[in-house]
From Swiss-Prot:
Catalytic center residues: D48
NCBIfam families: TruB
Name of the protein in its database record: tRNA pseudouridine synthase B
Gene name of the record: truB
GO molecular function: RNA binding; tRNA pseudouridine(55) synthase activity
Keywords: Isomerase, tRNA processing
Catalytic activity: uridine(55) in tRNA = pseudouridine(55) in tRNA
Residue positions binding substrate: H43, Y76, Y179, L200
Organism annotation: Salmonella typhi
Amino acid sequence: MSRPRRRGRDIHGVLLLDKPQGMSSNDVLQKVKRIYNANRAGHTGALDPLATGMLPICLGEATKFSQYLLDSDKRYRVIARLGQRTDTSDADGQIVQERPVTFSAEQLASALETFRGDIEQIPSMYSALKYQGRKLYEYARQGIEVPREARPITVYELLFIRHEGNELELEVHCSKGTYIRTIIDDLGEKLGCGAHVTYLRRLTVSKYPVDRMVTLEHLQTLVAQAEQQGVPAAQLLDPLLMPMDSPASDYPVVNLPLTSSVYFKNGNPVRTTGAPLKGLVRVTEGEDDKFIGMGEIDDEGRVAPRRLVVEYPA
């Protein structure tokens, strides 16, 4: 007879984890889920095992709104090894080509300029994008290359930090769907020497504050402190969470009176004053502006529910 499945806590919010190097995003996610004893958890855009930095982890009802973070812009610091190209475009891969590094400062500046603004990027075979139902990296590991279409991305800012010997350091502020490994690989080809990523750190996601990032070690320390103090771990862990609607913080807010919000929460579009003419909105209710979900302005100017918060008993 199987044991009943243990139910986790109904905890809702977003943890800004400083992902350590060498772990997959999913491994980190599962550790955080266990530490918080959360019944649901999901991350908002994977980081490669080699990469470190900001990985927002959504707990509970916040998972419903993680898509809005996937769509947000991000900022990275990257160090590239020049003169070597690898099959994965990073240091975890096998070197497939070595060439001398002979470009000038002017050639580097000219090459960097071609990656700024609206550009198209062909994703790496070592990515989680899917082709005919399978992830690209699954084909790549079998030595199979499949066709990939170029995708539009925007590089808002590409800052040159330093070039010393065979190392090049850059900072990149980019749109969703941008592969930093691919930018480095393409840059290496444009410079005629090849390149791959040796260090990658995600500095920011959307407008989340950098000083709210926490490490796995810090979470584990808090759990140990709670045990020593004889208090629930949640008492020390939960204050670290950002609000559950923070993934959608870029969207305008529409506040509904309680007389209207009851219909909205039952799945019905409602009319209200002060709403924008179109687009997605964060919806709150009452004088305390309690977040109740995401809505969208329909053709009649009403706020139609798109994703609703399930209200759990206190």
